Amino acid sequence: MVGQSDPSTSEKPSGICFSYAQIRGSVPVFWEQAAGLIPGQQKITVTRSPEGTQPAFDKHFGELEQNYGSVHVVNLLSETKPGEAELTNLYRYGVRHSALNHTEGQNSQDHQLLRETEFDFHAETKGPNGYEAASMIRRLIENSADGFAYYLSEEIDDSAEDPQEKSARRTVVVLQQEGVFRTNCLDCLDRTNLIQTIISQMAMESFLAHRGERAASDFWMRHSSLWADNGDALSRIYAGTGALKSSFTRHGKMSIAGAIADARKSATRLYINNFADKGRQNTIDVLLGRMMGQTPVHLFDPMNDYVTAELAKRSSEFSSSESINM
């Protein structure tokens, strides 16, 4: 999420840039899910032991730590559904045995580079408050949110020595984001998008509070609409329909029309999952040459070939060669 001041709002734009990064991704262990005719009852199979998973788990989070700093996992899986509960147990094992939690001489939780918060989304939101209860996640992650901060930069004028010369503008980094939230549910679509919307709102509220400002309700409506559009776009790519719960994300409340729309999307997903995805997967496997006994496939990319050939023709303009003895 990146926000920048609007030059049209003043004669001289302030040049303030706000940015906040989040990550979403499925549980980083080795597992697969079979199609099923009953929604939510698709069988989950773990294909590698916790010990066998740990090296890949550590590599994944090591790369995240290098790129973003501290990582706070927000796991939204169910505690009661057997498959999701098993994934949660494996996730918990990986976090507990991660090298990021065993920094030498720093056993305090304040120095952990990898933390985990488990928030059973369905259990927390099944009460009378519905999806509004999802906002309870705030108190569980607010310490990390405050510690991670956000990225903020500002353009300032460099005074020119000659009064007749135009002063140049340069960007000064005021604040750096020091960590990142990695949010997941099972497919990282509906539940994940709603919680990421809340985390994004927390970051924006912190930014505005530090500036002594408050956003109007219209601003938050636009913010919610952006996140609802984001959830719908990702869901169409992955599941073939818009995201569930997008009505709540967009309007802040769940209407009857929104509930009916979610039911329709669930039925469409069920059909696609059982009758369309298998054919698409077979097509992808054929294209990549992964079918049993298939002749290897060589993909033809004329644009890449053209660019490579043109670069080779003009290589003397940007490279040189020299013979050496070793």
Name what the model sees in each region.
Residues M1-V174, A203-M326:
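Phosphoinositide system proteins, centered on phosphoinositide phosphatases
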Residues G179-I198:
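A phosphate-binding catalytic loop at a beta-strand-loop-alpha-helix junction
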